[in-house]
């Protein structure tokens, strides 16, 4: 049996005709930049995120970068964040000219440990960037308490967590801005790159709109130095086709996660810990196991897809060496990087595929 880590073709087969019709409509109109479909998607993403405003952008990475630039965060500023995340979180801070300041993660959720944030605040701190990793939101109340105390912006990196909740509140709706990714592997994935910024701040919303189009405020008149962060209408129409299915697909992921949880009960496999305050959307199903690299190799030998998110925390990456971090500085992040691995969790996964995956893992430890 073969079990891919992700099977986008299986999802596409269920909506193929709708996708083709929607994309064809854009091509025939030749309205290939901006337009009503982008605006419609923005309105709908704002609604499902319980936010007033949304700005479509070219990727989740650009959602973060535009947010930083629109908040005037740059050279001389510091942004507190996590090292155990995808590169874009921290890469954007550096690209904006600011300095990333790392704090360690909670060992159970893998999200930033809010108890460590306040001690990292300095006179140069301008923002906190929590990451809602793998589909579960960070512990936002204590993060917002620190942010409010020191007048800091909060940029929610919600790339992996669209519609996930914390105490009933949606990802992206609690901080200053929320940043989503529509990379094809996401719960709501496009047919290429795409992203979205949500906010309840009207002034910031207007700035984000201007910044995504080079900083232009009227024809060939530029108030700011922005960039081309625009979302293509082809991506917008594909996402509009998928959006009505999102809740169903997310519930299927939750069903698959519960199935794994039950099968791994009482074994050496440590299943995902989901806080009682959170409802995860399970963009990834990440387990912890001893001898992780050997388990990964064993699964691959048995035609089961898996991956490691993330094998090297960002504070130990060569490009951030100048920041002065060394091994053992962020013990929980480094420990997680050596023990975690992601299993297939997509909605079309069958019980038989999950049974084979569980059986193969447990056989390794016999």
PLM regions: where:
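Phosphate-binding glycine-rich loop
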Residues: 29-78, 92-96, 102-104, 169
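Short beta-strand-to-turn element immediately C-terminal to the catalytic PLP-Schiff-base lysine
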Residues: 180-181, 195-200, 240
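Structural detector of well-ordered beta-strand residues that form the stable sheet scaffold
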Residues: 55, 80, 101, 153-155, ...
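PLP-dependent aminotransferase class I/II
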Residues: 9, 36-44, 48-52, 115, ...
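Conserved active-site segment immediately N-terminal to the catalytic lysine
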Residues: 156-191, 218-223
């Amino acid at each position: 049996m073969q079990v891919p880590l992700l099977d986008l073709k299986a999802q596409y087969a269920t909506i193929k005709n709708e996708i083709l019709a929607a994309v064809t409509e854009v091509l025939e109109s030749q309205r290939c930049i901006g337009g009503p479909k982008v605006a419609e998607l923005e309105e709908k993403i704002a609604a499902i995120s319980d936010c007033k405003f949304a700005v479509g952008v070219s990727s989740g990475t650009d959602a973060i970068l535009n947010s930083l630039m629109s908040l005037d965060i740059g050279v001389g500023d510091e942004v507190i964040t996590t090292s155990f995340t995808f590169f874009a979180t921290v890469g954007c801070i550096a690209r904006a000219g600011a300095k990333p300041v790392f704090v360690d993660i909670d060992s159970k959720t893998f999200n930033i440990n809010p108890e460590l944030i306040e001690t990292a605040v300095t006179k140069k701190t301008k923002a906190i960037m929590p990451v809602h990793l793998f589909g579960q939101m960070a512990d936002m109340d204590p993060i917002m308490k620190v942010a409010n105390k020191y007048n800091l912006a909060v940029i929610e990196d919600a790339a992996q967590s669209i519609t996930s909740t914390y105490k009933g509140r949606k990802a992206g709706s609690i901080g200053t801005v929320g940043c989503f990714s529509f990379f094809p592997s996401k719960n709501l994935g496009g047919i290429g790159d795409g992203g979205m910024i949500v906010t309840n701040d009207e002034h910031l919303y207007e700035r984000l709109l201007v910044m995504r189009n080079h900083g232009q405020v009227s024809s060939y008149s530029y108030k700011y130095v922005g960039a081309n962060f625009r979302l293509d209408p082809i991506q917008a129409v594909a996402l509009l086709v998928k959006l009505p299915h999102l809740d169903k697909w997310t519930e299927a992921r939750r069903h698959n996660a519960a199935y794994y949880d039950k099968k791994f009960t009482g074994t050496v496999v440590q299943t995902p810990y989901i806080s009682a305050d959170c409802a995860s959307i399970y963009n990834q199903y990440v387990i912890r196991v001893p001898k992780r690299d050997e388990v990964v190799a064993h699964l691959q030998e048995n035609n089961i897809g898996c991956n490691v998110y993330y094998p090297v925390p960002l504070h130990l990456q060569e490009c951030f060496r100048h920041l002065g971090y060394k091994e053992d500085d962020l013990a929980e992040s480094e420990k997680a990087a050596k023990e975690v691995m992601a299993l297939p969790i997509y909605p079309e996964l069958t019980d038989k595929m999950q049974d084979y995956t569980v059986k193969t893992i447990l056989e390794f430890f016999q």
